[in-house]
Amino acid sequence: MRTFLKTAVAAAAIALAGTLAASAEQVKVGFSPEAYPPFYSQDSSGKWGGWEVDIAMAICAEAKLDCVLTPIPWDGLIPGLKTKKIDTIMNSMSITAERQKEIDFSDKYYNTPTSIAGAKDQKFDASPEGLKGKVIGVQVSTIHAAYAKKHFASTAAEIKEYQTQDEANQDLAAGRIDATQADQIALDAFLKSDQGKACCDMKGNVAPDLEVLGPGVGAGVRKGDTELKEKINAAIKGIRANGKYNEITKKYFDFDVYGDAVQSN
């Protein structure tokens, strides 16, 4: 009987350990470690926060996933996902046909317009004709770079690429470029900063191009990782339904970022 009890207890312990391990599935969430307020920003202690961090963690909690933020440069996010350095990308990455050749995406979790900001002392709009002769800064390997090359290269003086959007913003403020294209919310945050207020203003939203800009931002997952994709999709629906999505969003925005406008990176 004693031997039987020991065996039973041992078996139960193994089963419990397996259950706990299963319930604490760790998922590495890839993001580019650059300031992209209000989506991602770093405090004085080095901790990352922002709307997208909060939404990512809410999705993970709803899906019962133990998520860990894993920094990788923007250019390395898709390669890192494919080589299993990370398990998903939640970094304002737009769902596009070109990216879907390499990775899969969850349903969208936000969608805002693409805009052009420029120097205050220059009057122009966000059209090819308006940007004629201008130097336009964009972040490399983003939908903004692809869009600018497709729609503005024939009229602009130069499409200048940067590793981060912040670098493009800094050059715009310094007068080294005439304009930059990015997500409207991110540009709005820059224009509300002391530096942005002093130098620049919004020139308008670019014309829609669903092929390049995509239908919105989703979580990137590896091709064939249907299980994680379905968990994330269910979690997005869950936090939209239970009010958590709106609760987080109201801390950062006074409008709906889930909307139907075209855009992000």
Language-model regions, residue ranges each:
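Extracytoplasmic small-molecule ligand-binding "clamshell" domains
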Residues: E25-M93, K101, N242, K251, ...
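Extended ligand-binding regions for polar small-molecule ligands
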Residues: V53-E62, Q122, G130, V135, ...
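Bilobed "Venus flytrap"/periplasmic-binding protein-like clamshell domains
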Residues: V29, P33-Y36, W48-A61, S115-Q165, ...
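Alpha-to-beta junction loops
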Residues: K64-D66, K82-N91, K134-V135, A173-A186, ...
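A ligand-binding cleft/hinge motif common to bilobed small-molecule-binding domains
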Residues: G76-P79, M93-K101, K149-K150, D178-L213
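Periplasmic-binding protein-like
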Residues: P33-E34, N111-G118, Q195-N233, F255-N265
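Ligand-binding clefts/hinges and TM-proximal coupling segments of bilobed small-molecule sensing domains
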Residues: D66, I143-K160, D201-K203, N233-N265
